[in-house]
Amino acid sequence: MAKSALRYTPAGIAVLEASFEHVGTVTEAAAERTLTFEFSTIALGAVAQALDREPLGKPMLLEGFIAPRTRRSTRLVMHITEYKVTD
């Protein structure tokens, strides 16, 4: 995980932008396929504050939703609504 500095909106809501790396194996058409990729995330409020306190490099299970970065963007970003550190 790489993260930017915790910032606040004019309304006082905490915002944390970060990128994560996923490494996993899936089965597609009866063949195993290894996936390795980075993806962008954003967290708001208490989740952003808690995630900012986590050390880099810990395995995590993320929950949330995927949405365009902005209204007119074709780039996607995952909005983290919950996370759990896994060991």
Language-model features, listed with the residues they occupy:
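Single-stranded nucleic acid-binding surfaces, predominantly the OB-fold ssDNA-binding core
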Residues: 1-87
